[in-house]
Amino acid sequence: MSSGGLLLLLGLLTLWEGLTPVSSKDRPDFCELPDDRGPCRGIFHAFYYNPDQRQCLEFIYGGCYGNANNFKTIDECERTCAA
């Protein structure tokens, strides 16, 4: 196979991997954590994965501490946790 063909194949495989949803067995453990505002008093719109509803939901993050199930965008949450 030519180097151009190999590059095309590599590009297609990379695209496929990026578009394939996360399966529950590949989902990071922190996706199972509850939403956690944290102790600070800021008001930041953030997203967390809700395993019971199997979707990412918005919540208000206080700005500090909390846990790893905390994403700035719904897209980031869905790429990481949603199946």
Curated annotation (Swiss-Prot):
Residues 1-24 form the signal peptide. SUPFAM superfamilies: BPTI-like (SSF57362). The record marks 41-42 as: Reactive bond for trypsin. One of its GO terms (molecular function) is serine-type endopeptidase inhibitor activity. It comes from the Eukaryota. GO terms for cellular component: extracellular space. Expressed by the venom gland. Coiled coil: none annotated. PROSITE patterns: BPTI_KUNITZ_1, BPTI_KUNITZ_2. Pfam families: Kunitz_BPTI. Residues 31-81 form the BPTI/Kunitz inhibitor domain. Its main location: secreted. It is found in: Secreted. InterPro entries: Kunitz_BPTI (IPR002223), Kunitz_BPTI_sf (IPR036880), Prtase_inh_Kunz-CS (IPR020901), TFPI/VKTCI-like (IPR050098). Disulfide bonds join 31-81, 40-64, 56-77. Keywords: Disulfide bond, Protease inhibitor, Secreted, Serine protease inhibitor, Signal, Toxin. PANTHER family: KUNITZ-TYPE PROTEASE INHIBITOR-RELATED, SERINE PEPTIDASE INHIBITOR, KUNITZ TYPE, 3. Serine protease inhibitor. Belongs to the venom Kunitz-type family. This is Kunitz-type serine protease inhibitor carinatin-1. The lineage of its organism: Eukaryota, Metazoa, Chordata, Craniata, Vertebrata.
